[in-house]
From Swiss-Prot:
The lineage of its organism: Bacteria, Bacillati, Actinomycetota, Actinomycetes, Kitasatosporales. It is an enzyme of class 4 (lyase). Its EC number is 4.2.1.41. This is Probable 5-dehydro-4-deoxyglucarate dehydratase 1. It holds the Pfam family DHDPS. It comes from Streptomyces avermitilis (strain ATCC 31267 / DSM 46492 / JCM 5070 / NBRC 14893 / NCIMB 12804 / NRRL 8165 / MA-4680).
Length: 313
């Protein structure tokens, strides 16, 4: 756990937000040694924070005891250099259980993912996230996606809730997000944080930057940190020529490849980590592995991305 509050640590985008994959052995059991190495490499490469056991880390596939062990390993490997945020989800009771496990493991905060299965109204969603935020002392980021979509008025209420420090958007509705940002700025002045949480968030980085959202999750950082870091630096320094070169030559083709299979937002990333020499194992069901041809295309694309970096030097 870091000494400074999570909101303060995240408010300055010093690097990409790292969402490590969870490593498994051939028999499907956790491989904490490889997971530790994966986390350590990411921190040493320049990650601003580690988001452990979230979407890319297959939160949905982890038993509570596995979750606690992974979060604890991430905390130990970061050793306070960057904050560790852990996923928490499912129904309210289970989400609270995972939140308390994360706190016991030493995490700095929570990424609160959508409730499982149900489609709730705004009042029910607010009740869920308020109870989750009150269950621990961890600062909480609410993740908007799928069945958890909020009105601007509801996000204002989230921003007024003790313990909730930010809002991550995985929906991609920029009109809605502009209204959210404006409403919170008007009703709850302060330092409420916003995150671009779309898969391969770099693709929409310019658009989100236009409404003042510069924090984002980077799956590419898992397997091509130099590319992710170059993009992050360019985006935050206004070097749009480099941003567009990487978008056109690497990120857009990567998104096109990711769209070739369901669950590729996780399994293709995991394949990328294996391509770079770290055997993190396969994804757990119900996700499936990318095809051999798609892995070959990924390898070629990664080579192209690194070539683009050389061209820009």
């Amino acid at each position: 756990m870091t000494s400074a509050p999570l909101a303060a640590r995240l408010s300055i985008p010093s690097g990409p937000l790292f969402f490590p994959v969870t490593a498994y052995r051939p028999d499907g059991a956790l491989n904490l040694d490889v997971y530790r190495e994966h986390v350590r490499r990411g921190v040493e490469a320049g990650a601003a924070a580690v988001f452990a056991c979230c979407g890319t880390g297959e939160f949905h596939a982890l038993a509570p005891e596995e979750f606690e062990r992974c979060v604890g390993a991430a905390v130990e490997e970061t050793a306070g250099r960057v904050p560790v945020v852990a996923g928490a989800g499912y129904g309210t009771a289970l989400a609270v259980r995972f939140a308390r496990l994360a706190q016991d493991a030493g995490a700095d905060g929570l990424l609160a993912m959508p409730p499982y299965l149900v489609v709730a109204g705004q009042e029910g969603l607010l009740r869920h996230y308020r109870e989750l935020a009150a269950a621990t002392s961890l600062e909480t980021i609410v993740y908007q996606r799928d069945n958890a979509v909020f009105t601007p008025e509801a996000v204002v209420e989230l921003a007024r809730t003790d313990g909730i420090i930010g809002f991550k958007d995985g929906l991609g509705d920029l009109d809605l997000m502009q209204r959210v940002v404006s409403a919170v700025r008007t009703e709850v002045p302060g330092d409420f944080l916003y995150f671009n949480g779309l898969p391969t968030a770099e693709l929409t980085g310019l658009a989100y930057r236009g409404i003042g959202i510069t924090l984002y999750s980077s799956a590419v950082f898992c397997f091509a940190p130099e590319i992710a870091l170059a993009f992050h630096k360019a985006l935050n320094s206004g070097d749009d020529a480099t941003v567009n070169r990487l978008l056109d030559g690497f990120y857009r083709p990567f998104v096109d490849l990711r769209a070739q299979g369901r669950g590729y937002a996780v399994s293709l990333v995991k394949a990328g980590v294996r391509l770079r020499g770290l055997d993190v194992g396969e994804v757990r069901p119900p996700l499936h592995e990318p095809t051999e041809d798609h892995v070959k295309q990924l390898a070629q694309l990664v080579d192209r991305g690194y070539a683009l970096l050389q061209e820009g030097m």
